[in-house]
Design a protein with these regions (language model features):
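A cytosolic-side transmembrane-helix exit/cap motif
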Residues: 56-69, 154-162, 184-193
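Hydrophobic alpha-helical segments
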Residues: 98-186
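Short, small-residue-biased leader/transition segments that mark boundaries at the very start
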Residues: 1-5, 198-202
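Alpha-helical transmembrane segments and their membrane-interface boundaries
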Residues: 3-115, 128, 132
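Short, proline-centered helix/strand-breaking motifs
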Residues: 43-51, 143-149, 199
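Juxtamembrane and boundary regions of transmembrane helices in multi-pass small-molecule transporters
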Residues: 81, 86-95, 167-193, 197
Length: 205
């Protein structure tokens, strides 16, 4: 399980970078033309779930190095996705907000529950020896990370900041509760903790 999250948390270059850019473009196009099917496809191929679950996992086992790499790559993915979607919507001739865009601007309590239990499903699936390859795409669809990011890009590109803040808040909620559920279940599994000799570093974790 540790090796899985080390790969997910540390690898953001080459293929993953281009996959993220393509996923962002697909999601932006789907939001622009109001196509739920296209948006779902973008959520399935986006690699942004890896660093988020890597953050929760690294906190659960006190792996400070993995935490730093996961946070760094999460921030990089966030910046790349926001920049790509903002650029797309800036040059897109379709400037009207579709119902799919509007749906990502008003987070509810249900979004919190979906993110929490979606993240829980992800860590449970990864902890199995026969890791079910259908679970992680399902989690990505349920928790919907890419659409809020692209909606935030739409808000920036069009100067409609209520779209940006509403969508960013939804993305933030999803991120926090996916990481939280991963952390809780990692602790529940009682995986081996990384020994930390420096008290200050332990406090940071």
């Amino acid at each position: 399980l540790g090796d899985v999250y080390k790969r997910q948390g540390t690898e953001f270059r080459g293929v993953n970078l281009w996959v993220l850019i393509c996923a962002t473009m697909v999601a932006s196009l789907g939001l622009n033309v109001n196509s739920a099917a296209v948006i779902i496809g973008a959520m399935c191929i986006s690699p942004i779930m890896g660093p988020i679950m890597g953050i929760g996992f690294s906190l659960g086992i006190n792996d400070f190095d993995l935490l730093k790499k996961s946070v760094r790559n999460f921030v990089l993915m966030f910046v790349v996705a926001i920049s790509t979607s903002t650029l797309y919507f800036f040059i897109s001739p379709l400037g009207n907000a579709s119902s799919e865009l509007l749906a990502r601007t008003t987070p509810t309590t249900y979004d919190v529950l979906i993110a929490f239990f979606g993240g829980m499903a992800g860590i449970v699936a990864q902890s199995r020896q026969d890791r079910n390859s259908t679970v992680i795409p399902g989690v990505a669809i349920a928790t919907a990370l890419m659409p809020p990011l692209c909606t935030a890009g739409f808000g920036l590109a069009t100067g409609q900041y209520r779209f940006f803040f509403g969508a960013f808040y939804l993305f933030f909620i999803n991120t926090v509760f996916i990481a939280l559920s991963t952390y809780i279940f990692t602790r529940f599994l009682k995986l081996s903790l990384i020994h930390i000799s420096e008290p200050t570093r332990l406090q940071l974790i």
